[in-house]
Amino acid sequence: MSSSGTPDLPVLLTDLKIQYTKIFINNEWHDSVSGKKFPVFNPATEEELCQVEEGDKEDVDKAVKAARQAFQIGSPWRTMDASERGRLLYKLADLIERDRLLLATMESMNGGKLYSNAYLNDLAGCIKTLRYCAGWADKIQGRTIPIDGNFFTYTRHEPIGVCGQIIPWNFPLVMLIWKIGPALSCGNTVVVKPAEQTPLTALHVASLIKEAGFPPGVVNIVPGYGPTAGAAISSHMDIDKVAFTGSTEVGKLIKEAAGKSNLKRVTLELGGKSPCIVLADADLDNAVEFAHHGVFYHQGQCCIAASRIFVEESIYDEFVRRSVERAKKYILGNPLTPGVTQGPQIDKEQYDKILDLIESGKKEGAKLECGGGPWGNKGYFVQPTVFSNVTDEMRIAKEEIFGPVQQIMKFKSLDDVIKRANNTFYGLSAGVFTKDIDKAITISSALQAGTVWVNCYGVVSAQCPFGGFKMSGNGRELGEYGFHEYTEVKTVTVKISQKNS
């Protein structure tokens, strides 16, 4: 343990064996109904890691049936004490902590994530989040309401039922825990579809769910593709709620499918084009570093990426100079290799999209300060790229890039920069850097974003609600607000002979 309380980084596993590649339903492993499998790759080497059973509509139907059975009135799960649900979640957190090294290695190998980030950040976050959710299990409660007349009225916060949960590829394990933690704490059952690029850690966690003692059918995990397995979840008539993290484009399809089927509840955590506003009085070293990590963390593959940096005119040139200097320090390579500080993009589709947007920036007149192209002969690597002299109408200033590409814009007045920052379809997050508390509060109140960070960026914790305004999504995850998304409120009114205050 280091002096800061952060665990030391252990040597990663070099002989990782992938044990779980099947569909997990009713605490058992199943082959796909169709007999199909799909390949899973290492994005740093482009090598195939394994073949995973490919779930589709028939497999989702099986999983939903199991989840519905587990949710029946009188089932072991429905009659379990809330505190016991919490104990199972605490147990799952302990098992993930036990397998932390294996899961971090797997996340790095399958997702291109730096091993140090996977172990120190992602796994730590998963364990803390599960324990936070476990603590809430017996604290979700209704209230009594003094209505007029001789009646006794109270509310119950009941689990919604069977919840479909569709997980993204950029934070496979973190997002799995963000989804199942609150859902299970509230007493729901779940059908999970991990991203087809990164299903391996979810399937390992499935084995831990069984080991922890969750009843059969409470958690079901169906790997597969979005247009088949994901679509089956979104449109399923016996799923009561769907939660999705991913692109705005797919989020629209999911909400449409939910509406056309059974009007299932929907929470969406979608894309962003988050502004980061740096005022002239800001601590420049701090602002440069947070803004840098805000866009380059995990190769830029973050929904909250600070991908529009607005810098006040008087400090613009110096901010650009320091940002370029910082971006040039990366060591690219296999994220499992010690010393490497930037890994690959997830797949060729994302890699090609990023390079296309970089080319658009060059053509539209932005100044390329560094990077600007691919790196290496193997794997989906993109050079860390910084553009200055970016204007608001350029594609790189409007479209979500999801890559290691920083756009730095200039502003003169607060009114101007607030309007420009809000001039987007997105509204996930934002950053403000200033030593003036009045300006910090004024700007943060004016920004249309679900989270605003002041003199920092990307600080996410289980205790805080997370979600977007506008086309960055609906609903909130985590914090007390996140649990409301997994309950229905029922009002019960009882006629009594005499009411007494």
From Swiss-Prot:
Gene3D superfamilies: Aldehyde Dehydrogenase, Chain A, domain 1, Aldehyde Dehydrogenase, Chain A, domain 2. The keyword Cell division does not apply. GO terms for biological process: aldehyde metabolic process; cellular detoxification of aldehyde; fructosamine catabolic process; gamma-aminobutyric acid biosynthetic process; maintenance of lens transparency; negative regulation of cold-induced thermogenesis; retinoid metabolic process; retinol metabolic process. GO terms for molecular function: 3-deoxyglucosone dehydrogenase activity; acetaldehyde dehydrogenase (NAD+) activity; aldehyde dehydrogenase (NAD+) activity; aminobutyraldehyde dehydrogenase (NAD+) activity; androgen binding; benzaldehyde dehydrogenase (NAD+) activity; GTPase activator activity; NAD binding. The record marks 170 as: Transition state stabilizer. InterPro entries: Ald_DH/histidinol_DH, Ald_DH_C, Ald_DH_CS_CYS, Ald_DH_CS_GLU, Ald_DH_N, Aldehyde_DH_dom. The N-terminus is blocked most probably by acetylation. Expressed by erythrocytes (at protein level). The modification N-acetylserine is found at residue 2. Keywords: Acetylation, Cell projection, Cytoplasm, Lipid metabolism, NAD, Nucleotide-binding, Oxidoreductase, Phosphoprotein. It catalyses: an aldehyde + NAD(+) + H2O = a carboxylate + NADH + 2 H(+); all-trans-retinal + NAD(+) + H2O = all-trans-retinoate + NADH + 2 H(+); 9-cis-retinal + NAD(+) + H2O = 9-cis-retinoate + NADH + 2 H(+); 11-cis-retinal + NAD(+) + H2O = 11-cis-retinoate + NADH + 2 H(+). Pathway: Cofactor metabolism; retinol metabolism. It is found in: Cytoplasm, Cytosol; Cell projection, Axon. Cytosolic dehydrogenase that catalyzes the irreversible oxidation of a wide range of aldehydes to their corresponding carboxylic acid. Functions downstream of retinol dehydrogenases and catalyzes the oxidation of retinaldehyde into retinoic acid, the second step in the oxidation of retinol/vitamin A into retinoic acid. This pathway is crucial to control the levels of retinol and retinoic acid, two important molecules which excess can be teratogenic and cytotoxic. This is Aldehyde dehydrogenase 1A1. It comes from Homo sapiens.
